[in-house]
């Protein structure tokens, strides 16, 4: 087989909302889902703590996170790549 194996780990893209903790960033994932009963499109959001070994991701950056083994009590995700740098105001 010449094709690469597909990873079973989930990947999500979201915005860094906190970078105050050492080696950890908090990422806000926003998604739009259809309400089961009424059919209206509603916004849902979740916050995940992701491991950032080098501390390269800053507040406002759009990053990709990948599911991993538990690193601590609340960290099960690792920041893998920078999608978009935060805009300087």
Swiss-Prot record:
One of its GO terms (cellular component) is cytosolic small ribosomal subunit. One of its GO terms (biological process) is translation. Disulfide bonds: none annotated. It comes from the Bacteria. One of its GO terms (molecular function) is rRNA binding. Pfam families: Ribosomal_S17. Keywords: Ribonucleoprotein, Ribosomal protein, RNA-binding, rRNA-binding. The keyword RNA-binding applies. The keyword Ribonucleoprotein applies. Belongs to the universal ribosomal protein uS17 family. One of the primary rRNA binding proteins, it binds specifically to the 5'-end of 16S ribosomal RNA. Part of the 30S ribosomal subunit. This is Small ribosomal subunit protein uS17. It comes from Albidiferax ferrireducens (strain ATCC BAA-621 / DSM 15236 / T118) (Rhodoferax ferrireducens).
